[in-house]
Amino acid sequence: MGVGLPAAFHRNIPYFEGSGVTTYAEIDVQRKIEKEQYVGLCEDSKIGISLIFTLQNGVEYMREKQAGLTKDVQTSVTFSGLAQDGMILLPVNKNEQQILNEKRASDTRRELMNAARKGDQAAIETLTFDDMDLYSKVSKRLANEDVFSIVDTYFMPFGAECDMYSIMGEILAVRERINRMTGVRLYQMRLNVNELTFDICVPADSVMGEPEIGRRFKGTIWLQGYITF
């Protein structure tokens, strides 16, 4: 699964090649100390955290680095995720006005986060107060509602490994595939997670529920990425 990746990468570790462009960002790449493997780090204002991922085209990156073409380069990244299992959840019911309000709030928050990164003290204070207000509202709702009826998507670091994340996102597309190395039946899903769009792959027999467009996938993924130089 996946075509055109360096042989040294997919010969040694599992991989899944995603599609499209997930984000445009300045990428920092570091080699893992214990192995010939590279991790990338980028920031995306949609998520609000630094994303660390296993780099699929590390050999190509080293070639570009030796040519002096990678320093402070803002480029596109295609993310993909490998999951061992997961759960399918029904969507949160929202009307058009709620969707519009959330879109406006998300755009405003993104602008504030960009300003905060540049040292804007007013933006930092606004974000702090907004987070406190959100925490208060969610805490009150949790007394009578299930958390998954309040939070419809999230992207959070998971465990000690820097490139593992716990996610929940809307299913935009789904299809079945077969792992040609193992013969295992897989679900390939395209997800919208905190406005980041990327593909994941998970063994079909390890998914609780039936994935359909509009429903949500919840699970833990190993985040991989392909940098386009």
Where are these regions (language model features)?
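Eukaryotic intrinsically disordered and solvent-exposed regulatory patches
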Residues: 156, 175-177, 205
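OB-fold (S1/OB) nucleic-acid-binding surfaces
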Residues: 173-200
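Long, hydrophobic alpha/beta structural blocks
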Residues: 1-159
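Short amphipathic beta-strand/extended segments with alternating polar/hydrophobic composition
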Residues: 51-53, 199-204
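Short nucleic-acid-contacting surface segments enriched for D/E, G, S/T with interspersed K/R
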Residues: 203-219
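Short coil-to-beta-strand transition motifs
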Residues: 158-170, 215
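Beta-strand elements of modular eukaryotic interaction domains
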Residues: 160, 178-180, 207-212
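Short, Lys/Arg- and Gly-enriched loop/turn segments at beta-strand edges
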Residues: 222-229
